[in-house]
Amino acid sequence: YRGVDGSVSLATPEFVELFRNMDTFSRENIEKLGEAVSADLKKLEEQGVDLDGYTMVEMVDDVETVRKGFGYTTINLYAGSYGTRLSYIYSLRYPKSIHRSFMFAINPPGGFVWTPEMIDKQIHYYGDLWKNDPEAVAKSPDIVKTMQNVLESLPQEWNGLNVIPDRLKLVTNFMLFHTDDAARVFDAYLAAEQGDYSGLAFLSVAVYDIVATTPTWGDHFTKGVVDYDPEVNYEAKINPPELFFGSPSTVIFAGAKYLDRPITYIPEEY
């Protein structure tokens, strides 16, 4: 996997260390994120790494090289999330190399950015499902309102653990990707509404490990930021006043504004 496995790993230790210890997604901290990534990428370039060679197009070409190497006439593609973008690009570049393509959790062009409006819509979709479940309603008549109330009344610390809203919302955002994790995070909010913030305090701290163990962040800054639009104010999308949750994961794109190198975009047709 180009940029992750093999001889070159696009590791970004300065970014990880800074991100793990951020308390708020303020403009000052977001700018520091961009500076940290810039420093990490500069070190990679000083080691002889050509960062322009680590785009999704190169990834797709690697797959085609492997197909040829194995002598397959056609191959089947099974892709989820980010992988669906690779599958999509592969289908455009090498349509005759594909036998079948199965995709789930589709990530179309532009899909690396989670807008606050879409996240709000998805949270309310969870809320609608909740209201149709008598067992769930017995715990809370409105899980969305529960989340909103809890986020508005968070203590600064709980039993010695700092409870930081921006970090908590970020890890909540990550956990809402899957229904099993969503159920767990809802349980934590339900407990907090009853005065037990231990689960949310743990999640606020656990984001450290989530960031540290997430696949190589430099890979994101050479592939994922292809959806970055310099005309968009990503900082304003993190905590928009009209929505209670916002888009905490947008902090990554907000930091891209402060990179000291141009973003390598892929051809427009992809």
In which residue ranges do the predicted regions lie?
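Gly/Pro-rich cap/lid or specificity-loop segments adjacent to the active site
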Residues: 1-166, 222, 228-270
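Alpha/beta-hydrolase-fold enzymes
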Residues: 130-224
